[in-house]
Amino acid sequence: VVADISRLIEKLFKEKNQEKSICVLEKSAEIGGHILSGNVFETTALDELIPDWKEKNAPLNVPVKKDAIKFLLNDKLSIPVPSFLMPTMKNHGNYIISLANLCRWLAEQAESLGVDIFPGFPAAEIIYKEGKVAGVITGDMGKDSKGNEKDSFQPGMEIFANESTVFAEGC
């Protein structure tokens, strides 16, 4: 989701004067709902994408204060690993974040630029037209655990893209 939304925000910034309709389908019931991990976040990409992210209250509130890497021998004993052995593990200037919170914040930024975001709608099938991807069909709703249609059943919706369809998984 972070990659999806970041790419869309970048596209909108580059094409500010062009009328575009952009839609993001998120399989989770809420943005960031499938992002369970924390992260040590390096801000270079965010600095380029949204230079005023600090003023916009991006959820980067905990700066890294210290790096410590230890080799765990058992539940009581560990050996510190000297920092010169792990030069890429220097995190000065980075932030400890919740990726789910960053996803939600990026979604807010995208929506403020006119992106329509629809959580709870996984893309289940690809629609092809003349040999090219033309859109997607969302997953059916209202089926029981065995796949049988309940009274609340609704078939998936067809969503067509005028220009392009981007598929992304992970971040």
Q: What residues fall within each predicted segment?
A:
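Hydrophobic, aliphatic-enriched repeat segments that assemble into extended interaction scaffolds
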Residues: 2-6, 20-27, 127-129, 134, ...
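Short, well-ordered alpha-helices that flank and scaffold nucleotide-derived cofactor binding pockets
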Residues: 3, 7-11, 108, 112
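N-terminal FAD cofactor-binding segment of flavoenzymes
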Residues: 8, 12, 18-76
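Residue-level detector of alpha-helix boundary/anchor positions
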Residues: 17-18, 158
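Feature captures the FAD/FMN-dependent oxidoreductase FAD-binding
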Residues: 57-171
